[in-house]
């Protein structure tokens, strides 16, 4: 999923450049683990508008976090986590971005991270039982919850949860049967990017992504992932209401077939299918991309490199994501994982992590702590109205997510098969 967000260390630092200047396939796990041991690294304290090294020993008050005393007392000494690139940083990529060292100092839990490249890989890794927890996207969370790989959590053990934006709590991608299964990390929308010379009057519609005859024909950039089928369904929601689609992740066979047919027709106008967002940013800069689906952080970087582009969330709405930190049912170090989940969602750490990656924080107090004072405005962190027509990535299931019981919906495994056939 978005995750060919598979940014290597150098790619992950792309969002640092932004701050300074203003598809899954069924793959086998790869050996890309990294052990984070930062005992000799000076932790970084961030205040609004600047990034400076901390002058005090890491502690609860400095980092706006008071861990649950009982959980802290049971800390095992280490934690093994599967995470997206850029979500767990110890200062080795960029010294000023280090939210691992303070955590290790406060909790005595050494952080060991296995970087995941795709949601499918991360599900496989969690099924191995070797990891204590994971940062999971919505196309993985349902599989993990229904498969018994992750545990229901006791919110009383998480002191940071009260400050999470209400719009991220109790959602289908982080809860099951009304019970919480994780802590929200952040959120982002998949926005429309367009070349301002090709569209001097601006754009407020996804039409150039789907319809022939626009100036963007042949220069359309498409996200290369099965979850993009939801984007096709979103367009059909707006343009073919007779199909009855009310949720782009709840498609019966007729609706699904219509989405695939639309994607097949899109091939004639597409100029690029992207998974590596650095490649897409290059297309924005060199002008070979005239319209596309992107993430705001990619557009920010490209604009800083001189790309003549603008972004918008079109009138039809958009898909998006909200990742969730989850605890393994087989965790060997459950208390250290609980502490990490609470820490990474606390104001200071959440501000650091989400600004580094380029997304809206999940903790409302984090907005006062980002190095770029405009970060939360740029990513609409506090604008709940912005998110009302953003359909967060969710795993499609046979049980229709829109509440219908008279039909069976197409499960995500079939989305993967259909996408692979389309791209073949």
Residue ranges and their predicted role:
Residues 327-393:
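Mature extracytoplasmic/periplasmic domains
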Residues 15-20:
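C-terminal motif of bacterial Sec signal peptides marking the signal peptidase cleavage site
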Residues 21, 58-143:
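Early extracytoplasmic/lumenal segment of secretory-pathway proteins
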